[in-house]
Amino acid sequence: MAAPPLGRLVLTHLLVALFGMGSWIAVNGIWVELPVVVKELPEGWSLPSYLSVLVALGNLGLLLVTLWRRLAPGKSERIPIQVVQGLSIVGTGLLAPLWSNMALVAGQLHSVAFLTLAFVLALSCCASNVTFLPFLSHLPPPFLRSFFLGQGLSALLPCVLALAQGVGRLECLHVPANGTTGPPIKVSPINFPERFSAGTFFWVLTALLGTSAAAFQGLLLLLPSPPPEATMGTGLRVETPGTEEEEEEEEASPLQEPPGQVASIVSSPDPKAHRLFSSRSACLLGLLAITNALTNGVLPAVQSFSCLPYGRLAYHLAVVLGSSANPLACFLAMAVLCRSLAGLYGLCLLGMFFGTYLMTLAVLSPCPPLVGTSAGVVLVVLSWVLCAGVFSYIKVATSSMLHSGGRPALLAAGVAIQVGSLLGAIAMFPPTSVYPVFRSGEDCVDQCGP
């Protein structure tokens, strides 16, 4: 059969990437904007712990999607996807003018509008993992990697936008100790205004979410209507060591077909796809849950404690470069995909090595090793980049291996992602918000001197 035009193939990959970009860009945008809004909102630096809880509660979106599937079995997958996209667009659109609104709750001021809308966005983002991923079962594995590339952009673009905004600009004013004489000392930190406001930041996020929704509509025009749920495979098939070469050939062949024909080829039930709870499948899903528990729950909760002792610059470099490692890992997976379970677990141990180093720095905050040195800055930033890159590659490789099981496998992958993220967030809430396990420093104050 004749190969499709290259332009059509590239367009489909682009639309899938833009579609994936809208999955978590709202919550990621709120996270990177915290250094700006926290200066205005009454919760202060406890705001990240509030947001962690709200994102964990956002897993209720999983229950809402499950309820919808029970009440409307066999219905088109586009409806929950469009609802999720609509909630994200409306939520960020309302954040732009309302984020700074406060109200009295139990006699104390709270940022009710910001927290409420953050919860709505958390619901939509968490639901995206069990609505967006099953839709991709109608496409071959290379398009799934384009989707994860888009998810990487959902973390990278807000960080780039935040740097353009000027997040983290801080200077310490030196003044004489006694009038006009005496040695200079550091006093209150000076925060310079950003290049544009938080409201403008949220408007840009709204535009990006609108672009993602438009990309999904474009995919619906390119692809035929997906088959009803009853005709989908009911099991999870993962390749065995003896069929790796055949699997690679089967995976490569759909790229030579138009997206419409690919959908009908990939979505047909596989008579061998019946081992949903095989040991290999369980290992892959467990690995997916562990990596997401670390990257979405455990490590983000301590990122400020591990980085801020080395300065605002180290913190923002770790955020931006660590986020950029995500799409780079997706590019690597598109070229070289690890199909060995032992290899993936080996990579997981490598990622845990970097994660352990970062957790150690957070526990020793505000006086970790090499504080105040360039070597300390390089090590903490490099550790965040490598940790994020390794775990991102594991996520893409694991999901690609699960793809052969069709929609049920990708649905199970989405559940594993959210369950892991939920457990990680719950585990880190007491030590970061209740018990003084991690201690923060003060700007322009040397707490590590003799």
From Swiss-Prot:
It holds the Pfam family SLC52_ribofla_tr. Keywords: Cell membrane, Glycoprotein, Membrane, Receptor, Transmembrane, Transmembrane helix, Transport. It is a multi-pass membrane protein. The chain crosses the membrane at residues 14-34, 47-67, 79-99, 114-136, 147-167, 201-221, 282-302, 317-337, 344-364, 371-391, 409-429. It comes from the Eukaryota. The keyword Zinc does not apply. GO terms for cellular component: plasma membrane. GO terms for biological process: flavin adenine dinucleotide biosynthetic process; riboflavin metabolic process; riboflavin transport. Its main location: membrane. Residues 242-252 have a biased composition (Acidic residues). It catalyses: riboflavin(in) = riboflavin(out). Highly expressed in the placenta and small intestine, moderately in the kidney, colon, lung, prostate, uterus, and thymus, and weakly in all other tissues. One of its GO terms (molecular function) is riboflavin transmembrane transporter activity. Glycans are attached at residue 178. Residues 230-268 are annotated as: Disordered. InterPro entries: Riboflavin_transptr. Riboflavin transport is Na(+)-independent but moderately pH-sensitive. Activity is strongly inhibited by riboflavin analogs, such as lumiflavin. Weakly inhibited by flavin adenine dinucleotide (FAD) and flavin mononucleotide (FMN). Plasma membrane transporter mediating the uptake by cells of the water soluble vitamin B2/riboflavin that plays a key role in biochemical oxidation-reduction reactions of the carbohydrate, lipid, and amino acid metabolism. May also act as a receptor for 4-hydroxybutyrate. This is Solute carrier family 52, riboflavin transporter, member 2. The gene is Slc52a2.
